[in-house]
């Protein structure tokens, strides 16, 4: 079975929704940021500090190559920048969790914002959000409104995948 690939801006709920899909759909969840943190033994912030954004993006590219060669029937929750710098379409069916920037801000606590290096300046984060939207749209096969509950979104994505299998 093909992978389900979740893309969207930081804080759009990719990991949370991925967990719901995994539970409902008999798949396992792979969060690319968590995989990188475990492999490197550092937080995303620490990786950014030690190798910079370009170094982090190279690590993401290596992970994509590994995932594409070795993983099937999974839910892959990508980091927010992964589809900006890498083609993720060959990992599986790509779903963009589309939410307004304001909805994302409401969802994230201050502590969660501090864990995200690109959220250190809200106006820059908003600009980045606006720049990335068109790329998310190009990379995705499906655009899903991310303002519903995680369970509702997970069910919608599974429904889309069921239709893909039938076709």
Swiss-Prot record:
Pfam families for the chain: SKI (PF01202)
One biological process term in Gene Ontology: chorismate biosynthetic process
Please provide, alphabetically and separated by semicolons, the GO molecular function terms listed in this UniProt record: ATP binding; magnesium ion binding; shikimate kinase activity
Q: Which Gene3D superfamilies match?
A: P-loop containing nucleotide triphosphate hydrolases (3.40.50.300)
E.C. designation(s):
2.7.1.71
The biological pathway it contributes to is: Metabolic intermediate biosynthesis; chorismate biosynthesis; chorismate from D-erythrose 4-phosphate and phosphoenolpyruvate: step 5/7
Q: Which GO terms describe its cellular component?
A: cytosol
Name the coiled-coil region(s). none
Where in or outside the cell it occurs: the entry states:
Cytoplasm
Q: Which HAMAP family match?
A: Shikimate_kinase
- Name under which the protein is recorded: Shikimate kinase
| Species this protein is from | Helicobacter hepaticus (strain ATCC 51449 / 3B1)
This chain is encoded by the gene named aroK
């Amino acid at each position: 079975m093909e992978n389900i690939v979740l893309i969207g801006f930081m804080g759009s709920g990719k990991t949370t929704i991925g967990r719901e899909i995994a539970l409902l759909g008999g798949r396992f969840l792979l969060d690319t940021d968590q995989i990188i943190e475990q492999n490197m033994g550092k937080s995303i912030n620490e990786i950014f500090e030690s190798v910079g954004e370009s170094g982090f993006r190279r690590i993401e590219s290596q992970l994509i190559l590994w995932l594409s060669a070795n993983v099937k029937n999974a839910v892959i929750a990508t980091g927010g920048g992964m589809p900006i710098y890498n083609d993720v379409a060959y990992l599986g069916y790509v779903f963009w969790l589309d939410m307004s920037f304001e909805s994302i801000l409401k969802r994230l606590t201050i502590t969660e914002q501090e864990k995200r290096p690109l959220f250190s300046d809200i106006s820059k984060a908003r600009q980045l959000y606006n720049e990335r939207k068109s790329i998310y749209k190009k990379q995705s096969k499906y655009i899903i409104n991310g303002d519903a509950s995680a369970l509702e979104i997970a069910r919608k994505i599974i429904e889309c995948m069921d239709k893909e299998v039938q076709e």
